[in-house]
Amino acid sequence: MVIGAVLAGGISKRFGEDKLTYRVGGKPLILYTIEALESASKIEKIVVIASPFNWQKFRELGLEVIVDALMVGPLGGIYLALSLGDSFVVGGDMPLLVPEFIDYLVAKFEEAKKLACVPRWPNGYLEPLHAVYSRSLREIIEGYIERGEYKVGNVIESSNPCYIPVESLPERWKWAFFNINKKEDLRKLKTFIKEF
């Protein structure tokens, strides 16, 4: 069992307003992510990692929140999540998560006994915000943060991870990587979610 950690500290610059509380199909966008995590059988507890500027919005939704005072981007969020235990880390702007895919990744992580289990595309591109990380990686991340190095990909590649080839996954599972950056992305989302 692992923690489900939802990174929610971004400023939504391209979206034009707080995208995670933007109502999509009648509910805040972040709740799609939360509900998928709640449906995954291998997720023990869910926390939202938020910035000092937006954490109250998520608490008002009844979510457990950790405030990210580090403010060094996703790497800081992963670091904080790992203080609670092994974590499946995801962006709060990913409304198409597949609970079976989450459980599959966690199972692969548990089986591989590596510091991270990360989906990887054929071109080498990683999906660091749809990945499982070991609590043991926290000390390594701390060293990167102390050196001012904040690229999650560098931490992953230095940790001898378990890679999951994206091309081997069912097509429906690949939708999970879709994230909302701009309001135009909501139009793309309509092709996936029938509530529109």
UniProtKB/Swiss-Prot annotation:
Sites where the protein binds Mg(2+): 93
Residues that hold GTP according to the record: 7-9, 19, 68, 93
Protein keywords: Cytoplasm, GTP-binding, Magnesium, Metal-binding, Molybdenum cofactor biosynthesis, Nucleotide-binding, Transferase
Primary enzyme class: transferase
Record GO biological process: Mo-molybdopterin cofactor biosynthetic process
A Pfam family: NTP_transf_3
Cofactor: Mg(2+)
Metal-binding recorded as keyword: yes
GO molecular function: GTP binding; metal ion binding; molybdenum cofactor guanylyltransferase activity
EC number: 2.7.7.77
Subcellular location: Cytoplasm
GO cellular component: cytoplasm
SUPFAM superfamilies per the UniProt record, alphabetical: Nucleotide-diphospho-sugar transferases
Reaction catalysed by this enzyme: Mo-molybdopterin + GTP + H(+) = Mo-molybdopterin guanine dinucleotide + diphosphate
Database matches in NCBIfam families: PRK00317.1-3
Domain notes: The N-terminal domain determines nucleotide recognition and specific binding, while the C-terminal domain determines the specific binding to the target protein.
Known role: Transfers a GMP moiety from GTP to Mo-molybdopterin (Mo-MPT) cofactor (Moco or molybdenum cofactor) to form Mo-molybdopterin guanine dinucleotide (Mo-MGD) cofactor.
Family listed: Belongs to the MobA family.
Protein known as: Probable molybdenum cofactor guanylyltransferase
